[in-house]
């Protein structure tokens, strides 16, 4: 892996911290330094621009990263001082946790020495539990500063179930963030190995790469060997919440034979991942036996991996989905560690032909029912959504979700707005993501150019994250989120003043912006030129606008001088 600190840095940027009500609440931000504006009358300084920062300690000059040691436990003191958790031995790691059986063992030895925490008997340790009792936790204050919003609003939104702060007590390394319609639209990046490709180092590097470009959460969707070890390395080194789909690992434990899945194996997998520090689980508890026939005449059937696994299990056993029948027990586990549940849309449409159909909305009704059960346990909930939806059908998805799930945060995969662009589905889906985000969706799951084609690599992760940062920011602008437009205004001003380096540095992808500019005008002098290669020096509209403004100012001065003479050379009448 290349030097972490070097590839995590952004140009003309520095890490700054805003301190809260206590010294250990230090909220990170990235401050972008701007060059001054040069005018005919002198120099005007431009204030630096502070932006939301997901890069964690990796961009702090005082921090020396070591993947073998992980990140410092930022939240550990906050967790322990509440007095409602206890340390315990935890379950031993088994060969099948890493995909091995028949006596074989993983050759990977984990370097992290830690014992897991859990709630003391009779205690609930979720942020929702505290919020309902009127407590503003350090985590809530942290996100309030990050979002430039009052901490009491954060508490109210979490208490009402309209926002979640994913924060497993066994992932103290994560910096608190919030998912809800009143806050910045967040994005998730999926990573993870498969049975045919990738390694632990590659997945850790993908995680770092994703948070460098702005991913707010990570989902580890590993399905190959070393699942447990891969996840441990990712969590210990992740400054953002980590989610998983536990049914994937449970299926690996039975060698991929769906019929052999049991509640006991799934429950053991939940506890295994809870002890590691997974912050939210996608659980496909809404795929009910009676809904499966509704998918038979679909163009693309059931496209969710988790949904198809549970549908196959239900049909094989002629029984109801065990995730549904054991949901109360699942909530008992979740509230013991403060793991949020992301209620999976196992029957989401996989083509625009199937959008908003009977199966999709039948499952949504069940997710609404499960939301209320989770809230009864003070478990934080978000609802997963589609998928593939043409633009004119997007609003109906949001309206139904808000009504049925009582305002629980909506978390959507796109949606893709057309099916004809394999290789460009980061674009087809970012269109839908911007629209659904503007309507109130709280988090957008990115789609990479490799969607439907293969496992994304590091470059695909970058493309997907940037596409979705654009969509999320566009949605923030549409929602009128406080301060969202400041970066746009700063970049527009830099563009009009031909401050090329400031334009690059204020952009979501400074490297790409600089690279494209320098393909045709690489000389350093071009960074102050009043034109680019698109129009050249004679046809640049902004250069012409400057000349027009200068002319108007000069004409205005001439007019004022004329009025001065006509008024008897008196300043006052």
Curated annotation (Swiss-Prot):
This protein's record includes keyword Metal-binding: yes
Residues engaged in binding Zn(2+): 388, 452
GO CC annotations, alphabetized: cytosol
Gene3D superfamilies: 6.10.250.620, Radical SAM ThiC family, central domain (3.20.20.540)
Listed GO MF terms: 4 iron, 4 sulfur cluster binding; carbon-carbon lyase activity; zinc ion binding
Gene Ontology biological process terms from the UniProt entry: thiamine biosynthetic process; thiamine diphosphate biosynthetic process
Positions contributing to [4Fe-4S] cluster binding: 532, 535, 540
Keywords: 4Fe-4S, Iron, Iron-sulfur, Lyase, Metal-binding, S-adenosyl-L-methionine, Thiamine biosynthesis, Zinc
Residues binding substrate: 190, 219, 248, 284, 304-306, 345-348, 384, 411
Classification via Pfam families: ThiC-associated, ThiC_Rad_SAM
Coiled-coil regions, chain positions: none
Stored HAMAP family: ThiC
Described purpose of this protein according to its UniProt entry: Catalyzes the synthesis of the hydroxymethylpyrimidine phosphate (HMP-P) moiety of thiamine from aminoimidazole ribotide (AIR) in a radical S-adenosyl-L-methionine (SAM)-dependent reaction.
PANTHER family linked: PHOSPHOMETHYLPYRIMIDINE SYNTHASE, CHLOROPLASTIC, THIAMINE BIOSYNTHESIS PROTEIN THIC
Name of the protein this chain belongs to: Phosphomethylpyrimidine synthase
């Amino acid at each position: 892996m290349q030097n972490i600190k070097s590839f995590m840095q952004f140009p003309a940027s520095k890490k700054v911290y805003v301190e809260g009500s206590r010294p250990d609440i230090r909220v990170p931000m990235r401050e972008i330094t701007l060059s001054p504006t040069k005018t005919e009358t002198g120099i005007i300084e431009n204030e630096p621009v502070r932006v939301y920062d997901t890069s964690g300690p990796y961009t702090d000059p005082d921090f020396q990263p070591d993947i073998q040691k992980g990140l410092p436990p930022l939240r550990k003191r906050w967790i322990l001082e509440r007095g409602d958790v206890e340390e315990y031995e935890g379950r031993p790691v088994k060969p099948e946790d890493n995909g091995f059986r028949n006596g074989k063992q993983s050759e990977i030895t984990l370097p992290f020495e830690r014992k897991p925490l859990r709630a003391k008997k009779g205690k609930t340790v979720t942020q929702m539990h505290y919020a309902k009792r009127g407590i503003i936790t350090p985590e809530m204050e942290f996100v309030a500063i990050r979002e430039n919003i009052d901490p009491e609003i954060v508490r109210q939104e979490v208490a009402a179930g309209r926002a979640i702060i994913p924060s497993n007590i066994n992932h103290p390394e994560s910096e608190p963030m919030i998912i809800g319609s009143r806050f910045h639209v967040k994005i998730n990046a999926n990573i993870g190995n498969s049975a045919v490709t990738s390694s632990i180092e590659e997945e850790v590097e993908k995680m770092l790469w994703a948070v460098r470009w702005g991913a707010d959460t990570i989902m580890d969707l590993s399905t190959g060997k070393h699942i447990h070890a891969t996840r441990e390395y990712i969590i210990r080194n992740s400054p953002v919440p980590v989610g998983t789909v536990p049914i994937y690992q449970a299926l690996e434990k039975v060698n991929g034979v769906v019929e052999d899945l049991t509640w006991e194996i799934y429950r053991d997998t939940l506890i295994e991942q809870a002890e590691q520090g997974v912050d939210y689980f996608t659980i496909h508890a809404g795929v009910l036996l009676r809904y499966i026939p509704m998918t038979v005449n679909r163009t693309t059937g059931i496209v969710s991996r988790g949904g198809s696994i549970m549908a196959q299990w239900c049909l094989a056993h002629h029984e109801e989905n065990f995730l549904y029948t054991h949901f109360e027990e699942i909530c008992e586990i979740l509230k013991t560690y403060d793991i949020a549940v992301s209620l999976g849309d196992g029957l989401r449409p996989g083509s625009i032909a199937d959008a908003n159909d009977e199966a999709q909305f039948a499952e949504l009704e069940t997710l609404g029912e499960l939301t209320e059960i989770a809230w009864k346990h003070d478990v934080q909930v978000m609802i997963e959504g589609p998928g593939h939806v043409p633009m004119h059908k997007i609003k109906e998805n949001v309206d139904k979700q808000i009504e049925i799930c009582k305002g629980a945060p909506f978390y959507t995969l796109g949606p893709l707005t057309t099916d004809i662009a394999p290789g460009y589905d980061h674009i087809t889906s970012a269109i839908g993501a911007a629209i659904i985000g503007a309507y109130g969706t709280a988090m957008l799951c990115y789609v990479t150019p490799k969607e439907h084609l293969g496992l994304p690599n590091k470059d695909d992760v970058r493309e997907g994250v940037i596409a979705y940062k654009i969509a999320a920011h566009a949605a923030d602008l549409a929602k009128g989120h406080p301060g969202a437009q400041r970066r746009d205004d700063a970049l527009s001003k830099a563009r009009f003043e031909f401050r090329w380096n400031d334009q690059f540095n204020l952009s979501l992808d400074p490297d790409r912006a600089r690279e494209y500019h320098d393909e045709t005008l690489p000389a350093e002098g071009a960074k102050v030129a009043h034109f680019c290669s698109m129009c050249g020096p004679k046809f640049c509209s902004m250069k012409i606008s400057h000349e027009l403004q200068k002319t108007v100012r000069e004409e205005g001065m001439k007019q004022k001088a004329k009025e001065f003479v006509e008024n008897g050379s008196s300043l006052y009448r």
